[in-house]
A protein has these predicted regions:
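Ligand-binding pockets and gating/stacking loops
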Residues: 1-433
């Protein structure tokens, strides 16, 4: 029996005067054949990396047990609603190379494919990072090879590029992070500056209505939900821009930029929302997002936690004080809350026969385990998602002491379809499924 269905290209976009809106994966895009078997195209695997600087308070991070039934530690308590979707990995190390700043090396080399003896002219064990190895493979079929995002509003250049970037094309070639949400939105959706005051949805509405007439009921619902999510992000950016304009009316000597008027939780969520939009529309399959830079005295203001800017790095060196350590634990807890919020959004997006999260590897981690001691052993690492079946989540995997984190990176690279057997100082692959 031949079924008559509308078939759409995965690259179908909505167009308007001055804007282009990519679409999420619809059922009409998945139909591989119109036979009675109704074979569908499998959604692609995506990889996202969520960086937290300056390590974590070790005593509050580590659970005492392993496996599927492990009990969450105080810091990890926010992942409770997504525990079955997250893999906790412990005892993964990087070898620290002497001669460079501990924080700069932690951030810049976190995802590095270099072994400890492969040093750049600047003295860092730094080569192409694993996100860029993945992007070389996946970027051939997406609009953007990769996205590099930062939630750092600070623009003081006292610190070098190594503190504020985790993605590198190779020695001396940084993939610089975007930190302006509005500029990122316009880049993703092709919004021209002279008409960016309106909604991108208004610009493509005629094309959207035309498409809607040809869709089935399920796809109509998906399209409506997606358009709503795009508008929600637009409104977030509009609110922050309005707040910036109000502040600038006070005639402060240095005008405030939109992202500098955000609390850090707002910043992380709006950048994370844009990353998720890029993933679900297949504009990219690889992205990195830094919650803050390494070491910088970046003003960190968190709604309901820190009403005045605090110095995260400075606090890590005061952990001997119980009051300071308590604040640090609250900050670690905050980062896990932000991660969980983004993961929940991915889990709520239907894709194929599952969800976007089922096809994700969303990794939270830091290149330094203890910010006060500057050590790289037992790095904090979480992975949300199932990577299209390559990962069996819901477990605490405790590796043998001295296991290089490169073993994890190698397994993740393979899950993205890149066939290599060695990466940096890897000694094998981690079994994640």
């Amino acid at each position: 029996m031949i079924l008559k269905r509308t078939s759409l290209s995965r690259r179908k976009v909505l167009r308007g005067a001055g804007a282009t809106l990519a679409l999420p994966l619809l059922e009409a895009m998945q139909i591989k054949s119109f036979s009675k078997t109704n074979a569908y195209v499998k959604p692609p695997v995506r990889a996202g990396f969520f960086y937290i600087p300056n390590g974590v308070v070790q005593t509050a991070w580590h659970p005492k047990d392993t496996g599927e039934g492990y009990k969450l530690s105080p810091t990890l308590e926010p992942i409770k609603p997504i525990k079955n979707d997250v893999t906790l990995l412990t005892k993964l190390d990087r070898i620290k190379v002497a001669g460079t700043d501990g924080h700069a090396q932690a951030g810049a080399c976190w995802l590095s494919s270099a072994s400890p003896d492969e040093l750049s002219p600047a003295g860092y064990p730094l080569k192409k990072t694993i996100d860029q190895i993945m992007a070389e493979h996946t970027g051939k079929v997406t609009a953007f090879r990769s996205l590099e995002l930062s939630c750092n509003p600070y623009e003081d250049n006292r610190e070098s590029v190594y503190f504020d970037n985790i993605s590198w094309y190779g020695h001396g070639h940084v993939a610089r992070s975007l930190r302006d949400p509005k500029a990122l939105f316009n880049r993703l959706f092709g919004v021209k500056q002279h008409i960016e005051s309106g909604s991108v949805l208004d610009l493509v509405m005629d094309d959207a209505k035309s498409l809607n007439h040809s869709l089935g009921s399920t796809d109509k619902g998906k399209l409506d939900e997606y358009m709503h999510s795009v508008r929600t992000v637009e409104q977030q950016i509009e609110r922050v821009t309005k707040r910036q304009e109000d502040i600038n009316r006070l005639k402060i000597s240095s005008p405030v930029k939109p992202w500098q008027a955000m609390t850090r939780d707002e910043f992380i969520q709006v950048m994370g929302d844009l990353m998720i939009l890029a993933f679900r529309t297949d504009l990219t399959r690889v992205a990195t997002i830094m919650s803050s830079p390494e070491r910088w005295g970046s003003p960190l203001k968190v709604h309901g936690l820190f009403d005045k800017p605090v110095d995260h790095h400075g606090m890590t060196h005061g952990q001997g004080n119980q009051h300071v350590r308590s604040k640090l634990e609250s900050l670690d807890h905050f980062h896990i809350q932000q991660f969980t919020s983004l993961v929940m959004k991915m889990k709520n997006i239907k894709e194929g026969e599952g969800t976007l999260l089922d096809n994700m590897m969303f990794t939270l981690g830091s290149g330094i385990s203890d910010g006060s001691l500057h050590i790289y052993t037992d790095l904090p690492t979480l992975i949300a998602g199932g990577a299209g079946g390559a990962i069996k989540p819901g477990r605490h995997i405790k590796s043998e002491k001295g296991t290089p984190i490169a073993n994890l990176w190698l397994s993740m690279i393979n899950a993205m379809g890149v066939k290599i057997d060695q990466l940096g100082d890897s000694t094998g692959k981690l079994k994640l499924s």
